[in-house]
Amino acid sequence: MVQEAQGSKAPVQRIVDKVTGIFVPVVLGLSVLTFFIWMFFGGVDMLSHAMLSAVSVLVIACPCALGLATPTALMVGIGKAADHHILIKDAVALEQMRKVNVVVLDKTGTLTEGHPTVTGWLWAQPQEEHYKDVLLAAELKSEHPLAAAIVTALQEQEHIEPAALDSFESITGKGIKVSYQGTEYWAGSHKLLKDYHAALTDVLGEMLAQYESDSCSIIYFGRKNELLAIVAIKDQIKATSVEAVRELRTQGIDVYMLTGDGERTASSVAVRLGNIQYISDAMPDDKEEFVRQLQLQGKTVAMVGDGINDSQALACADVSIAMGKGTDIAMDVAMVTLMTSDLLLLPKAFNLSRQTVRLIHQNLFWAFIYNLIGIPIAAGLLYPINGLLLNPMLASAAMAFSSVSVVLNSLRLRY
């Protein structure tokens, strides 16, 4: 993947290729023009001067420096990113990243550790033996990380075995529903709770608020229109998340958090991250719509997620960034993949993009300046002033030096 990315072309490289395609015939024309000017105005040694100057123009002109300016910088930039566990899919992604002014972060698995654990159970109804068996069987079929936390907690308890379910259905962005012995059970977010019109008692509401203020995600478990239990699950915020958000802000990038959690939980997490802006109760469609709204405002948006309930938003973002532990969908869609859970790689990736593009511009600038100055000197512009006529051997040395200088300038990025 790294080799493919290093061999890809950035948009600026396509422009340079067109310029180089024009540059070569122009240089040939200038060489011929130089020859005839010397033949007409060269005086006694006009033939030797004409030959030397025409050859020097051909030799000193260096499309190589122009051609090397972009790919050498890209190869070094993408290689350095890989050294830091940042995989960049192609040169377009590397160049696009420098334009990003808004980063949208999914919460679970991106800002948090991705290792949720159950911290509490609140039973709204007297427990029956099969309730936990049904919940275990249902969550075993779910791919959501919160489901894994419930499965782990239930499996640690004695005498709980997965029930034989009649059916299973995943409800995108809300949860799951199953059938057991002809009765429908469900587990998911408070949106699913509302869909089933299940009541929440005042006592449960107060206890629930305490869990939410502690940044816990809440899973509701019910039967038909009856709430059976509430499961509080906590996923610790990564140690690097706060610092990563701070660095992104330092780079002038606005940061948003999207989460399917309720308002209180989302607010609690946002405060801990430094009072970042957030959207709570976000369904997959809501996340995609939010990214599109930012784009309509003229923003260049990077979406960072693990592919669970955010693959649509990843697909429509200007720059899609997947966490290394994300889903296969996220990996396929993502233009950039952070191979570790360290969120500090995110500001580092944006900074590396800006450094690489800045280096490309430097290389192109000096390549153009070299040709702009070198070709007239090779043609004999200084001869009437100080008698200097450039030897073709010196012209070839200057040409080689220009190419080497571009490569050396690109290699600076590694250190």
Predicted regions and their residues:
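Actuator/coupling domain of P-type ATPases
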Residues: M1-A54, I237-K238, L352-L359
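Conserved cytosolic headpiece of P-type ATPases
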Residues: M1-V2, P63-K80, K107, L111-G120, ...
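Conserved ATP-binding TGD loop and adjacent catalytic N/P-domain core of P-type ATPases
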Residues: E4, S8, I88, Y180-G182, ...
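Membrane-water interface of transmembrane alpha-helices in multipass transporters/channels
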Residues: I15, G29, G42-A61, A69, ...
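Membrane-embedded transport module
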Residues: L30, A334, M339-Y415
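Conserved catalytic phosphorylation-site environment of P-type ATPases
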Residues: L52, C62-A138, L294, A313, ...
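Re-entrant/interfacial helical elements at transmembrane boundaries that shape
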Residues: A69-G79, T117-G120, A149-A153, A315, ...
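Signature of the cytosolic headpiece of P-type E1-E2 ATPases
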Residues: L146, Q155-S268, M283
